[in-house]
Amino acid sequence: MQHLVDATRLAMEHKNWYGALALALTMPDICGRISYPHLAKKSEERYVLWFDTYLAAKYQGGFIQEQILARANMYALRCAFLHQGEFDITDQKARQALERFHLTTPYTGLMHNNRSMNIDADGNITNSVLQLSIDIFCEDVCAGIEKWMSDNATDARVASEIRQLGILHAGGSSF
């Protein structure tokens, strides 16, 4: 798993934001599969359980202490970006109230984890957008993955699953 965290950070270092984001959205899937083997065909459930444990606390706040990045929206972003290349999640069945993400590259003074929305005369929320700074978001996911690895460091089954992950071999090596 550490090789994927390192690859995410290397992508950020080289300003390969799309690569970093793709890995950051994929790693919780891997951890969820390993952590919750009894949920074999339920990737969404595994994903949000991992999110609740390792990332949700970083995305709670605001004036009413709401969950700014809800578990369903995190999974919807994963689906929209990895399968369709989009940040608009309106077509994702997993989403919760949010319509789209506005991801930005690093910029001093830019607000991270900032939600914008309109409320119509009937009290309905429209045009709900969550702005995330991609470097902070990806690093938060990396930190969550490292916490997960630490929490599971003595679990032989988890260690065995991690050893089975795909590893790239140096050019010229034979099998």
Name the predicted role of every residue range.
Residues 52-167:
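Long, charged low-complexity segments
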Residues 40-49, 54-58:
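Lumenal/extracellular "mature" regions of secretory-pathway glycan-modifying transferases
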Residues 1-46, 65-69, 73-76, 83-91:
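Amphipathic alpha-helical interface elements
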